[in-house]
């Protein structure tokens, strides 16, 4: 079974308390705490897309079976929900559905009365003041993203200055086995200038960056990354690292600094002269999903 039974709770570290804040949610995946204490949550699953020809049908069949067994199969609710704990007792007594027409939403960011939501293939901006109970209109598209086949979640982080938005897009494949052409615009972090609308690749070679945040001390962007599979139970470590502008972390050709993945059949680009080593190894296959 997935989760905890009635009356059961996760074990908390000494000095901390864990309680059930909300339940009855249809596959919640990402959370955003707003400055007024409201919590936004996406209810979402992978998009149903035509993946076309090619790929590894047996791998996809097994993966689909495992996802369904874990509760990740089925249709996406496509909802953005607001949870409100008005009396501060640690339990959300208020629940409002702000949107139910999104498309496999995941990333959420808020700043300057604007709410940013990442569908699997785009980033939308909505007018939203703190304390609001509605999210009206269609939203302004501020960026297109590679559609959500493969790694479909799209994490967002707003720069502390409020003028740039960062969007993480994972790879479609494990090590580019289906061709590097389909990996265009993937395995990277986009920087979106909110004043001009221009996009640039901020960091690349990141197989599946699944958490984004800025250090309150250095101001640097940090991320947690899910690394490649099928090299055994001891490789490759997922990692936590800072992301300097223009950096490359090696995917798919190299992992963890200077280890070449001989399975990759596509030649390494000549322009890739330096691969950065991640700051902290988290262990293989731990699948860190937030930061």
Task: Locate the predicted segments by residue.
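Conserved loop/turn at the beginning of each blade in beta-propeller domains
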Residues: 14, 24, 76, 91, ...
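Residue position within the beta-strands of beta-propeller blades
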Residues: 40-42, 117-118, 166-168, 222-225
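Asp-box/WD-like beta-propeller blade repeats and closely related beta-sheet repeat scaffolds
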Residues: 91-114, 119-161, 171-174, 198
């Amino acid at each position: 079974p997935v989760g905890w039974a009635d009356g059961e709770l996760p074990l908390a570290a000494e000095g901390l308390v864990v309680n059930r804040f909300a339940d009855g949610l249809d596959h919640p995946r990402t959370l955003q705490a707003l400055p007024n204490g409201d919590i936004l949550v996406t209810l979402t699953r992978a998009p149903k897309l035509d993946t076309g020809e090619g790929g590894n049908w047996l791998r996809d069949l097994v993966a689909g079976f495992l996802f369904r067994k874990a509760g990740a199969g089925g249709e996406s609710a496509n909802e953005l929900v607001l949870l409100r704990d008005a009396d501060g007792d640690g339990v959300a007594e208020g629940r409002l559905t702000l949107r139910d027409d999104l498309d496999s939403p995941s990333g959420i960011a808020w700043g300057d009365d604007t709410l940013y939501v990442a569908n699997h293939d785009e980033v939308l901006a909505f007018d939203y003041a703190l304390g609001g109970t509605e999210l009206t209109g269609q939203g302004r598209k501020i960026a297109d993203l590679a559609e959500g086949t493969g790694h479909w979640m799209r994490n967002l982080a707003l720069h502390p200055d409020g003028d740039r938005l960062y969007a993480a897009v994972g790879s479609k494949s494990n090590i580019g086995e289906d061709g590097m052409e389909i990996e265009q615009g993937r395995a990277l972090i986009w920087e979106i200038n909110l004043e001009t609308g221009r996009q640039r690749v901020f960091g690349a070679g990141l197989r599946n960056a699944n958490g984004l945040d800025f250090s309150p001390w250095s101001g640097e962007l940090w991320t947690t990354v899910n690394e490649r599979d099928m090299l055994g139970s001891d490789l490759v470590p997922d990692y936590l690292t800072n992301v300097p502008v223009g950096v490359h972390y090696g995917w798919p050709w190299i992992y963890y600094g200077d280890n070449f993945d001989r399975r990759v059949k596509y030649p390494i680009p000549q322009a890739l002269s330096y691969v950065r080593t991640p700051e902290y190894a988290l262990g293989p296959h731990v699948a860190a999903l937030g930061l």
